[in-house]
Amino acid sequence: MRNNMDQRHELVSTLLAIYRNEHVRPAKDEARRIADFIESATATDPSLTYDEFGLNRTILALKAIRLAVDEIGIRGHALTAYLLRAVVSKPDQCELVERYFGKDVAQTLRGFLRVEAIEVKTEAMRTDNFRNLLVSQAGDMRIVLMLIADCVNLMRHIKDTENVEAQRKVSTEAAYLYAPLAHKLGLYKLKSELEDLSLKYLEHDAYYMIKENLNATKRSRDAYIERFIAPIRKMLDAEGLRYHMKGRTKSIHSIWQKMKKQQCGFHGVYDLFAIRIILDSPIAKEKEQCWKVFSLITNKYESNLKRLRDWLTVPKSNGYESLHITVKGPEDKWVEVQIRTERMDEIAEHGLAAHWRYKGVKSSGGGVDSWLADIRSALETGNEGLLTQSLSSNAKEREVYVFSPKGDLYRLPPRSTVLDFAYTIHTGVGNRCVGGRIDGKNYSIRQPLESGQTG
């Protein structure tokens, strides 16, 4: 009994610490209600206490919430819904959740359950269509953000598991589903962590081969970086610019991809690192000073203009801004140099979380990529009502993603019917179609389809 009381006190205290921002739910009473709900659920069904890795579901969820708050910037009822997801597995339980915690929490929880109901097949998971299906089924962009945080947190905690099969399944989802979504959202730090951890679990020998080689060559690499940046430092100082520089070793996953693409060993990859120059510039002078540094560097070192990447003039759809150039340094080695400001660097590293501080970065485009990028402006408001309106996805107004009986995933226009799906598969199938069987039930050719269905 004493142990249960201690756990309850710890849960409430942890919740209050995580939800410390005055604009973030829950208040003290709600923290206690959450504790009551979880305590009751696990007492009724003890199997809800631990997951397939033997980890305590509630404690694991609390750690994921802290990650989501600190590293992504998520706020509001999505956090409560995610925590309750640890002990709620059936849609009909959401009615009870709504009575305890309100409509918004229950609706978000239903989104989590819809995503969990999707049957994940590795072949389909590798496609943009599957990622778009997940986004569509979630219905609320914060659910997708929480799922990214959930995946990162879980990957951090399963390194010593004996359940290797489950570890490989989670790692595959991390590599092909959540890392690409994190990339689209500009969450590069989390994306890189997911990629490295998935490689560690899926390609153990390759991961440690690269890691050991990086450790063995660190001293010579650091010495080369110092020789490369010394003249640049003198030039920047002479111009009176405020800045700092660092050499950034490419991620293990990135190096592994280069080795496969170039069909070479570790020592055949020439660009193991990049130099990052980060300027302390006022926003009004950001571009001017970045291009000034570009001019100084290309005057000093021979440049490869084919490798110029200008994301200052036109930022990436996820808000990424930087200027990349590859130049020939000492010993005729090609070196990538990234030029950006403090603001740009924080957004590049922390994505959405940084946009709570830096306002006004906008993107344009179409489709799901544009939608993912545009949620940034809604997150900046901090207004729960506007967030709900801006982040909610009306599936009926978006593309429909449906599976064929063989498990292939198809993207269809909004309001597509059984007949539309038949013609998408093959003209002959459409010509012969007089009805369809969707999720085991018969429907007319005019029946509208919903994302996630199997026809």
Regions found by a protein language model. Give the residues of each.
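Generic structural signal for well-ordered secondary structure
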Residues: 31, 57-61, 76-77, 90, ...
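Hydrophobic or amphipathic alpha-helical targeting/insertion segments
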Residues: 81-115, 187
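Short alpha-helical scaffolding segments that buttress acidic/His motifs in well-ordered protein cores
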Residues: 34-41, 78-84, 108-113, 144-155, ...
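Alpha-helical scaffolds flanking conserved acidic
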Residues: 59-63, 74-84, 104-108, 142-145, ...
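An amphipathic alpha-helix signature
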Residues: 16, 32-35, 65, 94, ...
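N-terminal alpha-helical scaffold/docking segments in eukaryotic complex subunits
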Residues: 24-34
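Outer-membrane beta-barrel domain signature
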Residues: 51-55
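Nucleic-acid processing machinery
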Residues: 2-23, 42-50, 60, 66-70, ...
